[in-house]
């Protein structure tokens, strides 16, 4: 007897022989484990990997274990979107939209036959050498689940409880042996996780505090990012580099902070990180003149000709849920493009047309008041209306300056503006004194 018939009284903490327990559950599990197919073992393995990789039960493609997934592009401090798939490339669905990468966990027991095309966007994880302990946990887990599926009442609960015990043991083994038990293949090169991570501080890359422990998922993400770094650089060579980590979870907040800063709100560290990465800052000043992204927008608008607008679909391309600005070179997502457009509105270079309104430099508050989704669905951009030269001439004449300076100012020359500012500055003390004299009678 293996202890199956021993029970503990909850009130006295005493053990006793329980003759009502007429089923030896452990023996049933052992017996079923001997008859398990490789496919059943693979399913059990994937259950453990799913828990360790923190995958949700919400599958976009029923029947396929595939999830949208993010990996950090470590050199640029930004997450890239891709897919995590349990299985081989020839088994995954082809309907999903293209992303930047695929991470595959290959079946360890019923190994699939497929040709690795050494593609730059594919990373393969294989369990190399499960020992007897792991095989025992795995088979016990699969057997207990199998028995639970046909049992009922108390027996079902016992089998499910034993399955969870085995799953915990299996997960613990995978966590502890991960670095040597897994091989990672990228573009035909196969190494253990340990070898891939040589010379790299995984804890530092995972940004862990001194008390935090690196987990299974962190290691997979960091090593995948190391392998895919060149791939990310190849498909978006001039993508921005951020000073804070931009994730799918925080990017809406970061971009919102940047837009609020452009609208006159507090310029937070996050806002500066976004504006600076998009080259919209010259020191503390917002100035898109040196931003390659802003200048690309302006050159496209200029190419349309005088008085023409630049439509949204002339700036963003791709399917409705995956759009990019200049996908070959910059590969900017719509929220980052909107920030660039906001910088150009701020500088007076652009008017942003959205549903029911046009945002120019006099309506910057709209960048904060409108939702990011609304701004991302902008209609078009256009050049601001030309300055009224007659009014500008009158202004220069009012301050005893040559009216011809108005023409130069309207063409972007800064010298007339400086002269006008000097005249205004000289007049301010006189105006203040006059106001004070009037108050004193």
What are the residue ranges of the model-derived segments?
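Extended alpha-helical scaffold and adjacent linker segments that couple domains
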Residues: 1-441
């Amino acid at each position: 007897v293996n202890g199956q018939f021993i029970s503990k009284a909850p009130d006295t903490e005493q053990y006793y022989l329980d003759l009502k327990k007429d089923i030896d559950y452990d023996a049933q599990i052992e017996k079923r484990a001997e008859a398990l197919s490789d496919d059943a073992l693979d399913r059990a393995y994937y259950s453990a990997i799913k828990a360790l990789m923190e995958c949700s039960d919400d599958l976009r493609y029923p029947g396929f274990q595939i999830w949208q997934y993010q990996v950090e592009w470590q050199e640029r401090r930004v997450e890239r979107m891709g897919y995590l798939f349990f299985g081989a490339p020839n088994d995954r669905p082809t309907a999903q939209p293209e992303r930047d990468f695929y991470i595959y966990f290959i079946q360890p027991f019923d190994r699939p036959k497929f040709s690795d095309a050494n593609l730059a966007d594919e990373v393969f994880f294989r369990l190399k050498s499960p020992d007897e302990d792991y095989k025992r946990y795995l088979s016990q887990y699969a057997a207990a689940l199998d028995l639970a599926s046909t049992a009922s009442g108390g027996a079902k609960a016992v089998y499910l409880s034993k399955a969870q015990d085995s799953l915990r043991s299996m997960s613990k083994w995978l966590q502890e042996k991960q670095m040597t038990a897994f091989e990672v293949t990228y573009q035909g090169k196969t190494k253990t996780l340990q070898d891939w991570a040589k010379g790299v501080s995984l804890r530092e890359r995972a940004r862990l505090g001194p008390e935090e422990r690196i987990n299974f998922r962190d290691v997979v993400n960091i090593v995948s990012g190391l392998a895919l770094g060149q791939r990310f650089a190849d498909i978006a060579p001039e993508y921005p580099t951020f000073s804070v980590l931009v994730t799918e979870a925080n990017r809406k907040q970061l971009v919102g902070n940047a837009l609020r800063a452009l609208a006159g709100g507090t310029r937070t560290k996050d806002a500066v990180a976004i504006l600076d990465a998009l080259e919209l800052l010259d020191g503390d000043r917002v100035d898109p003149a040196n931003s390659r992204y802003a200048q690309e927008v302006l050159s496209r608008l200029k190419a349309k000709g005088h008085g023409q607008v630049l439509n949204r679909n002339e700036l963003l391309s791709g399917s409705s849920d995956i759009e990019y600005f200049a996908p070959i070179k910059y590969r900017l997502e719509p929220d980052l493009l909107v920030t660039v457009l906001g910088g150009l509105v701020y500088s007076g270079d652009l008017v942003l047309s959205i549903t029911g309104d046009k945002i120019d430099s006099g309506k910057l508050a709209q960048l904060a008041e409108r939702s990011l989704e609304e701004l991302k669905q902008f209609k078009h951009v256009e050049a601001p209306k030309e300055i009224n030269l007659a009014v500008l001439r009158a202004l220069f004449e009012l301050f005893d300056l040559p009216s011809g300076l108005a023409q130069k100012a309207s063409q972007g020359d800064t010298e007339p503006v400086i002269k006008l500012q000097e005249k205004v500055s000289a007049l301010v003390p006189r105006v203040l004194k006059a106001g004070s004299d009037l108050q004193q009678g």
